[in-house]
UniProtKB/Swiss-Prot annotation:
One of the essential components for the initiation of protein synthesis. Stabilizes the binding of IF-2 and IF-3 on the 30S subunit to which N-formylmethionyl-tRNA(fMet) subsequently binds. Helps modulate mRNA selection, yielding the 30S pre-initiation complex (PIC). Upon addition of the 50S ribosomal subunit IF-1, IF-2 and IF-3 are released leaving the mature 70S translation initiation complex. It holds the Pfam family eIF-1a. InterPro entries: NA-bd_OB-fold, RNA-binding_domain_S1_IF1, S1_domain, TIF_IF1. The keyword Membrane does not apply. It comes from Streptococcus gordonii (strain Challis / ATCC 35105 / BCRC 15272 / CH1 / DL1 / V288). PANTHER family: TRANSLATION INITIATION FACTOR IF-1, CHLOROPLASTIC. The gene is infA. It is found in: Cytoplasm. This is Translation initiation factor IF-1. Its main location: cytoplasm.
Length: 72
């Protein structure tokens, strides 16, 4: 997937699931299933319920995303 095709939105982590999956509520109210990107996983950045995050979504599947940044 090229970087041009990506949709970036902010959201809030609602629930944590097994295998580094998270339920994220976006700013527009939709809830999606998101996983952790490789750089966050590599640097052992912990994501907990209630954290504000940036999510990258593909225009082809708007129900899934990739967490790319956790706000402090």
């Amino acid at each position: 997937m090229a970087k041009d095709d990506v949709i970036e939105v902010e959201g809030k982590v609602i629930d944590t699931m097994p295998n580094a999956m998270f339920t994220v509520e976006l700013e527009n109210g939709h809830q999606i299933l998101a996983t952790v990107s490789g750089k966050i996983r590599k640097n052992y950045i912990r994501i907990l319920a209630g954290d504000r995050v940036t999510v990258e979504m593909s225009p082809y599947d708007l129900t899934r995303g990739r967490i790319t940044y956790r706000f402090k």
